[in-house]
């Protein structure tokens, strides 16, 4: 049997990470405006609306009266998961809210939430998105987190430790498990938005749905490419700021930072992909670990599956056509992966695992 290498991945995932009509047809379901070009993302459509006049330049800048973000349903083609209306705060934004209230159709076929931007207080249930907010310089908007043990960001840990100290500045509340969040703590932190990962057939979000707080369904992990997932940062940049300012000594808005950061990631990713393509086929790889009686692995067309393909690795499920996770039995995994070169999985414990423990 080949020597098996065990890779223990940290909690921070790499940043490689439509209307009631799915995909790019979502723009047709939105009100007339300028559609932001999305080169890779297939599940997200953003339409910007200018102040009375629609111009082709509006989609490229950060000046707009309001914007629509349309999230396609990854699990039901041709339908929309959620629609967001992003309206800047302030008097002009108040007028826009009133204007839209008068003309908006009451027959919406999907959940629609109005979000006043920039969002200054949020509960973030997803560790990679916490890291992204630090990269964009809008970490001050993180006021609550879930699954704290999985967040490997020292400043988040420090701010959670300050929770309850009214003189401590911008602290963070530990809201418990993302699967069963502490509703009372979430209410107390007064979030303007809750950022979480949606799941197929979830049946809603229980008590969270009753808080009347916009729930941002971050379906980026269901994109069909790593760059498609990364491109969602343009949406998050719009959520957390379209005003010029300074954070961590870096000037500029979260929105403009998202554009420049994505351009940098795209350039580096394509460069590395091209270099990997020139090399001989890499090692075979198996991912993840057994959860209960099920072993969930990324589908061949998932962001992780495509990432491994672009890295020239031999992923054992690369021929699979699913963009989500595959639920396999341990027996199926052993039958297909017992001769793999590399076993890679996420692990959040304090000490390394041994083969005996696994």
Spans of model-derived segments:
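N-terminal ligand-binding lobe of clamshell/alpha-beta domains
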Residues: 20-358
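Bacterial Sec-dependent N-terminal signal peptides
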Residues: 1-28
């Amino acid at each position: 049997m080949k020597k098996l290498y065990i890779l223990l991945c940290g909690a921070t995932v790499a940043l490689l990470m439509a209307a009631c009509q799915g995909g790019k047809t979502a723009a047709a379901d939105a009100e007339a405006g300028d559609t932001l070009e999305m080169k890779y993302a297939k599940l997200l459509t953003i339409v910007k609306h200018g102040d009375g006049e629609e111009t082709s330049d509006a989609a490229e800048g950060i000046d707009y009266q309001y914007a629509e973000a349309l999230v396609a349903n990854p699990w039901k083609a041709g339908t929309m998961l959620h629609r967001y209306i992003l309206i800047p705060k302030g008097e002009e934004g108040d007028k826009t809210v009133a204007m839209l209230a008068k003309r908006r159709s009451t027959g919406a076929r999907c959940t629609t939430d109005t979000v006043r931007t920039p969002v200054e207080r949020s509960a973030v249930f997803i560790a990679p998105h916490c890291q992204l907010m630090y990269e964009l310089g809008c970490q001050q908007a993180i006021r609550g987190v879930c699954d704290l043990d999985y967040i490997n960001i020292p400043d988040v840990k420090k701010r959670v430790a300050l929770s309850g100290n009214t003189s401590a500045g911008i602290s963070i509340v530990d809201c418990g498990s993302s699967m069963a969040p502490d509703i009372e703590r979430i209410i107390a932190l007064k979030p303007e938005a809750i950022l979480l990962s949606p799941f197929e057939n979830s049946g809603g979000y229980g008590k969270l749905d009753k808080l009347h707080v916009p729930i941002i369904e971050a379906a980026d992990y269901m994109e069909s490419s790593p760059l498609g997932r990364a491109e969602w940062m343009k949406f998050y940049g719009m959520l957390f700021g379209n005003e010029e300012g300074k954070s961590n000594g870096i000037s500029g808005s979260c929105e403009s930072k998202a554009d420049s950061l994505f351009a940098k990631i795209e350039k580096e990713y394509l460069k590395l992909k091209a270099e990997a393509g020139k090399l001989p086929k890499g090692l075979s790889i198996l991912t993840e670990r057994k959860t209960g009686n099920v072993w969930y692995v990324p589908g061949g067309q998932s962001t992780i599956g495509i990432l491994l393909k672009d890295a020239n690795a031999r992923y054992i499920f690369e021929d699979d056509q699913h963009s989500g996770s595959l639920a396999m039995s341990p027996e199926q995994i052993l039958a297909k992966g017992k001769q793999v070169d590399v076993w890679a999985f996420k692990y959040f414990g304090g000490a390394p695992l041994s083969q005996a423990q696994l």
